[in-house]
Amino acid sequence: MIRCFAWTPLVGAPLITTVHFTSPPSLRIFASRSSAPSSSSSSSSTVAAASRRSISLSIIAVTSSVVSSFCFSSPALADFSEIPNSGGVKALDLRIGDGDVPIEGDQIEIHYYGRLAAKQGWRFDSTYDHKDSNGEAVPFTFVLGSSKVIPGIETAVRSMKVGGIRRVVIPPSQGYQNTSQEPLPPNFFDRQRLFTTIFNPTRLANGEGSTLGTLVFDIELVSTRRLHR
């Protein structure tokens, strides 16, 4: 089984491409029948073995070619930099902003696109889907330093400028620690799927805690406003 996922850079609401191979691509191989009779069963076995090797190599070649074309179409993890003193949050700036840098206590507005790595990049929420009465996307608002949101998002925006877009990989320790931390998907079934994956007791007992809650967020810093002068 081969699974890969590639994410496109954020332009408005970014797209996600997921590719699954539950079995290798099927190949049909035609062989001409020899007019001469087989000399021995040993010869037949040799030909059969060679055919099997040929099929295996062909499958590997085709599979590798297809996977390469999809899996490496997005920025590699090596392109990310770990944010200092972040607990392991890795960031890649897709666009550098030209506005203010937020400070503690500011009211922040962001657009985001959140995915869960343990579900092959399943998108669990996006503010681009949250519309007001005019059909405009409604940004997510919070106060920096209030501990209202998961630590990884606060860490990400602290070093951004307004107008910037940043992709961050958030390890479980900087992600959801309970089901009340924001941002929360407004859809009940999305919330349920998100938290039953992250806090799955069986998988946690199997030692998967270091990966289950890994999140990938594309964050656009829309605005920052000083609440206290």
Curated annotation (Swiss-Prot):
GO function term, MF aspect, one: peptidyl-prolyl cis-trans isomerase activity
Signal peptide as annotated in the record: none
Recorded catalytic activity of this chain's protein: [protein]-peptidylproline (omega=180) = [protein]-peptidylproline (omega=0)
Gene3D superfamilies assigned: 3.10.50.40
SUPFAM superfamilies given in the database record: FKBP-like
Localization, UniProt: Plastid, Chloroplast thylakoid lumen
Entry coiled-coil feature ranges: none
GO cellular component terms, A-Z: chloroplast thylakoid lumen
InterPro entries named among the record's database cross-references: FKBP17-1-like (IPR044197), PPIase_dom_sf (IPR046357), PPIase_FKBP_dom (IPR001179)
Record key words, sorted: Chloroplast, Isomerase, Plastid, Rotamase, Thylakoid, Transit peptide
Range of the transit peptide: 1-63
Primary enzyme class: isomerase
E.C. number: 5.2.1.8
Residue intervals of the PPIase FKBP-type domain: 105-225
Stored PANTHER family: PEPTIDYL-PROLYL CIS-TRANS ISOMERASE FKBP17-1, CHLOROPLASTIC
Family named by the database record: Belongs to the FKBP-type PPIase family.
Biological role: PPIases accelerate the folding of proteins. It catalyzes the cis-trans isomerization of proline imidic peptide bonds in oligopeptides.
Entry protein name: Peptidyl-prolyl cis-trans isomerase FKBP17-1, chloroplastic
Organism the protein comes from: Arabidopsis thaliana (Mouse-ear cress)
